[in-house]
From Swiss-Prot:
<keyword id="KW-0602">Photosynthesis</keyword>
<feature type="site" description="Transition state stabilizer">
    <location>
        <position position="335"/>
    </location>
</feature>
<dbReference type="InterPro" id="IPR036422">
    <property type="entry name" value="RuBisCO_lsu_N_sf"/>
</dbReference>
<keyword id="KW-0479">Metal-binding</keyword>
<dbReference type="GO" id="GO:0019253">
    <property type="term" value="P:reductive pentose-phosphate cycle"/>
</dbReference>
<feature type="binding site">
    <location>
        <position position="204"/>
    </location>
    <ligand>
        <name>Mg(2+)</name>
    </ligand>
</feature>
<keyword id="KW-1282">Carboxysome</keyword>
<feature type="modified residue" description="N6-carboxylysine">
    <location>
        <position position="202"/>
    </location>
</feature>
<dbReference type="GO" id="GO:0031470">
    <property type="term" value="C:carboxysome"/>
</dbReference>
<dbReference type="InterPro" id="IPR020888">
    <property type="entry name" value="RuBisCO_lsuI"/>
</dbReference>
<dbReference type="InterPro" id="IPR036376">
    <property type="entry name" value="RuBisCO_lsu_C_sf"/>
</dbReference>
<comment type="similarity">
    <text>Belongs to the RuBisCO large chain family. Type I subfamily.</text>
</comment>
<feature type="binding site">
    <location>
        <position position="205"/>
    </location>
    <ligand>
        <name>Mg(2+)</name>
    </ligand>
</feature>
<feature type="binding site">
    <location>
        <position position="174"/>
    </location>
    <ligand>
        <name>substrate</name>
    </ligand>
</feature>
<keyword id="KW-0120">Carbon dioxide fixation</keyword>
<feature type="active site" description="Proton acceptor">
    <location>
        <position position="295"/>
    </location>
</feature>
<feature type="active site" description="Proton acceptor">
    <location>
        <position position="176"/>
    </location>
</feature>
Amino acid sequence: MSYAQTKTQTKSGYKAGVQDYRLTYYTPDYTPKDTDILAAFRVTPQPGVPFEEAAAAVAAESSTGTWTTVWTDLLTDLDRYKGRCYDIEPVPGEDNQFIAYIAYPLDLFEEGSITNVLTSIVGNVFGFKALRALRLEDIRFPVAYIKTFQGPPHGIQVERDKLNKYGRPLLGCTIKPKLGLSAKNYGRAVYECLRGGLDFTKDDENINSAPFQRWRDRFLFVSDAISKAQAETGEIKGHYLNVTAPTCEEMLKRAEYAKELNQPIIMHDYLTAGFTANTTLARWCRDNGVLLHIHRAMHAVIDRQKNHGIHFRVLAKALRLSGGDHIHTGTVVGKLEGERGITMGFVDLLRENYVEQDKSRGIYFTQDWASLPGVMAVASGGIHVWHMPALVEIFGDDSVLQFGGGTLGHPWGNAPGATANRVALEACVQARNEGRNLAREGNDVIREAAKWSPELAVACELWKEIKFEFEAMDTV
């Protein structure tokens, strides 16, 4: 081996030392099976470590391998259970990086457990000393494994049927300020936004239960606000009540209370709470007919660095299996990170039933979801009325467009802010349906609508120069 390795000779003549992983776990002649879980890792080895050895080490440490020979290897069939690096390809423009393709036998994983999959595939291997950095770029779940999951509690079509809303994106808003409002004032803000034309309002991800606003009080005032807004508008409304809690028992207690109040949707922070809690809640939502909105708080800690961590497309696939009806995906045009091709790659992986391999969009494997329900993409973060044409053109109908500051920042108040967004949305949808090109004519569509909507005209004037123009870090 070409990197530092020590071996010791015992009195019995047995040689112990660091494994040469290439001999066992690098198998370029292997053809992956339809039942294998496949993973694509971006590997940056330490200087002097051959690519094949580094790739084999990843396969070993994320499956059956350990650092030395152990006699209990003889008690099982390692050739049946080991992970295998079956291909290596260079990363364009990077001399010391490569993509390692690894196949894992399905029998290594517990059925219906994303927790177990991630514990195995992205567990200890990320701290391996032979690697300078490691990133899981993509994963392929076989149909045989997908069939062991419930997936989203309801899915896109069932949600539209519940809400009786078709043919357009849904509109939402995160209530601001995110922290500090009393439950009564919070409910007032919810009512004004829903009355003005939004479909949903939302708890911020870090609102759980605090001294200034206990969860039960918030649920009550929000429920009253929704009932009043529905009576005035004749539309079904909802608010993402965040049931994330310190324990699973408390989480389910809050979910049950939301159900008692006849609320159509609740919310969960799936990464900070964990996949076990999320899968538990998703199953409860299916059993109780409640929609589940998912926030991805903490995702950038895991996926922001290009060379190390887990790409969000993997976290998105994991969420579709664990369960959620909505998930935040970035906006492409707003304040949060997200390049268009990459973002739409994982949006397709959330919504579509079958997605072909397309490495230009970061999709390393063809993914067949075996008719598992889709997840609605949520675009949220630094967006306003001038972004509406681009959002409709990029995300299409099966999405939720959430304007927090872009609603509550309206000079005339929350309800006019909501009205401005609803007018802008319906103008863009109508223009698209008439065959107009929103990418080219979007600003004209907004200006035309503003002529007969004073709420939209004021919003257009306020945010006409607000842009977030930074180079995306998430590129292929």
